[in-house]
Amino acid sequence: MKYLITITKELVHEYHLYYMQQNPKCKSLPFAKKETIKLFNKNGTPQLTKSGAQKTKKKSISKKNYKMSDCLYGILSLNELLVIQNRMVMNGIKHHWGNLGIWLADKYNLSNLKLSNCMVEFRVFSETLAKKDNDNISGGIKFVGDGLFVQSGFLEDDNYMIINPLLINCGYDKLNPRTEIRISVFPDELKDVYEKLRIHTENFKEGGV
């Protein structure tokens, strides 16, 4: 048995529409790119750097300025997580990603399946040729996985007795950037990782998805 979950900008936009229904007073959206704003002094003059350029800062894009092309499709990176020093901000991010995971499980009819033996592969296809580290998205995988795998009841748990192995790889697709979550399910008695990999490869070989 296999499952394929594909996260695209279109899918995240669909989640944002749901999010706005649930949170009608929200001013920004959890999975949208930040917008760059110019900084001004109280008298209206621009704030300048030492080199004379106008200072800017990034902030969450407002709901009124948001459009589907602003949606994120990739998993949060460790680089993005490690710079967060405020515990409340970190907890808020974990909460949003967990809720997205629960929503994905509901959308794909995976909630409460309580599966007990599987392997999971995360594949992130970027729209640029930036050379990303595969392990850089491991932190983000944990956040979305808590909602998708555990809180939704899709799996019994997310420990290594349930998910083993876990694969991470990155790729490039300018026309269709996305994150694929590929899941192969096995009988409880199958523990050999290499046999699982063989079956998983057959499940998702080119043209077999």
Each PLM stretch: what is its role?
Residues 1-209:
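Catalytic phosphate/metal-binding cores of nucleic-acid and nucleotide-processing enzymes, i.e., regions
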